[in-house]
């Protein structure tokens, strides 16, 4: 990602297509002044909700937004099975963001989630631009463990970010304030519901009586999380250390949530818009 440092200005001779791909809720200067920085551990979802409501003219204290979103925490002191379970659902899902925004706004604001996995028949920036111009406020739910720049450490979480504007091939987001290429954002928005857990986070919580079979959800069985842990332990005993992460199920779905005021034409349009077609 490239941090935003200055406002992007389009030339007067931009063609119609470029104009159709441009829309801003806030200017970059306004975003710098108005954005909410992360309000707590695992609270990127609640942070996004604060800014969504702000953009829609509803002021809510960060603590109230966090309470309404019901941010879930990592249980770092738990034995491995419970720790992994907590990691799979830490933070919030798009469903929690929608419910939290509705509760915090006392029913004034509604949200509608659009799945982007499996891949959809949509051009992301023009699609976002159309909704932003209508007054909708988008929040991206992304798997940040995809498209990691070479040489950088793999992030350890998914992330919710408010999108405050788009330009041709570029998406503008808060928390942190970034401009990111459309290709990069789209890849992170089209992810299976999985999470990578670092080797050291697994091994330091492993105990002799550890029973991974307590994770009985079929998705844990399908990913053979127990087998992955066994493989990691075997490699450690043999001094190999090849497996850097295990893959576990995640509660999150990748995609875009669009928010609007309920008592508006846009709110009703959002509720009645069909899902994006699968490719």
Question: Which functions belong to the PLM regions below?
Answer:
Residues 4-12, 73-203, 207:
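Conserved active-site-adjacent core of cysteine acyl-enzyme catalytic domains
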Residues 5, 154, 166-279:
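Noncatalytic regulatory segments and standalone regulatory/sensor domains
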Residues 9-120, 210-211, 221-224, 228-235, ...:
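Cysteine-nucleophile protease catalytic domains, especially the papain-like/related folds used
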């Amino acid at each position: 990602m490239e941090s935003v440092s200055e406002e992007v200005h389009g030339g007067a001779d931009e063609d119609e297509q470029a104009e159709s791909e441009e829309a801003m809720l806030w200017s970059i200067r306004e975003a710098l002044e108005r954005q909410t920085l992360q309000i707590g551990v695992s609270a990127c979802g609640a942070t996004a909700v604060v800014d969504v409501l702000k953009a829609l003219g509803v002021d809510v204290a960060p603590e109230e937004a966090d309470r309404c979103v019901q941010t879930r925490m990592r249980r770092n002191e738990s034995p491995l099975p419970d720790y992994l379970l907590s990691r799979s659902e830490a933070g919030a899902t798009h469903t929690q963001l929608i419910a939290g925004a509705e509760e915090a706004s006392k029913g004034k604001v509604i949200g509608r989630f659009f799945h982007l996995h499996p891949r959809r028949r949509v051009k992301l920036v023009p699609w976002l631009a159309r909704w932003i111009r209508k007054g909708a406020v988008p929040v991206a739910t992304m798997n940040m463990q995809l498209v990691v720049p070479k040489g950088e450490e793999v992030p350890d979480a998914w992330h919710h970010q408010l999108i405050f504007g788009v330009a041709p091939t570029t998406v503008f987001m808060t928390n942190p304030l970034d401009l990111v290429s459309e290709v990069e954002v789209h890849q992170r928005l089209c992810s299976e519901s999985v999470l990578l857990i670092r080797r050291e986070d697994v091994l330091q919580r492993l105990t002799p009586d550890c029973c991974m079979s307590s994770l009985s959800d079929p998705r844990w069985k399908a990913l053979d999380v127990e087998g992955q842990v066994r493989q990691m332990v075997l490699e450690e005993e043999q001094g190999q250390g090849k497996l850097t992460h295990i893959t576990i199920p995640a509660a999150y779905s990748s995609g875009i949530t669009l928010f609007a005021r309920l008592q508006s034409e846009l709110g009703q349009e959002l509720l009645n818009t069909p899902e994006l077609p699968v490719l």
